Amino acid sequence: MKQFEIVTEPIQTEQYREFTINEYQGAVVVFTGHVREWTKGVKTEYLEYEAYIPMAEKKLAQIGDEINEKWPGTITSIVHRIGPLQISDIAVLIAVSSPHRKDAYRANEYAIERIKEIVPIWKKEIWEDGSKWQGHQKGNYEEAKREE
């Protein structure tokens, strides 16, 4: 288990939260993003995530560094699951600790936005009558390969 990682097994929240705890931290905010059944009136059967793992983990760690620069004293742990995920499964977990709660909340929100912007993870939504790749799956893979 690593502080910033891509996994294929179900995410266990406590072990990632523990990465962020020490005697200086007064707040820990843990966000979990789950697979929802309905999106814009369409019923999702399940999701399939893919990632360019080496670059994805590098980018997750970069987000942790960015957070520590913006909110000194914070500690971050981020994990994203890939493969097939069923309804209610945890797809992403972000744990951020800070001496004070406001920074932990702000940093956690920053992390999920940055994941969507820079991490080469691709999501396919599967419905009863079809499927579609969602998000930034065009371009990020080639960009990720160039950055490696």
Curated annotation (Swiss-Prot):
It catalyses: 2 [molybdopterin-synthase sulfur-carrier protein]-C-terminal-Gly-aminoethanethioate + cyclic pyranopterin phosphate + H2O = molybdopterin + 2 [molybdopterin-synthase sulfur-carrier protein]-C-terminal Gly-Gly + 2 H(+). It is an enzyme of class 2 (transferase). The keyword Ribosomal protein does not apply. Substrate binds at residues 34-36, 44, 100-101, 116, 123-125. Pathway: Cofactor biosynthesis; molybdopterin biosynthesis. Keywords: Molybdenum cofactor biosynthesis, Transferase. The keyword Metal-binding does not apply. SUPFAM superfamilies: Molybdopterin synthase subunit MoaE. Its EC number is 2.8.1.12. GO terms for molecular function: molybdopterin synthase activity. Pfam families: MoaE (PF02391). One of its GO terms (biological process) is Mo-molybdopterin cofactor biosynthetic process. Converts molybdopterin precursor Z into molybdopterin. This requires the incorporation of two sulfur atoms into precursor Z to generate a dithiolene group. The sulfur is provided by MoaD. Heterotetramer of 2 MoaD subunits and 2 MoaE subunits. Also stable as homodimer. The enzyme changes between these two forms during catalysis. PANTHER family: MOLYBDOPTERIN SYNTHASE RELATED. Belongs to the MoaE family. This is Molybdopterin synthase catalytic subunit. The gene is moaE.
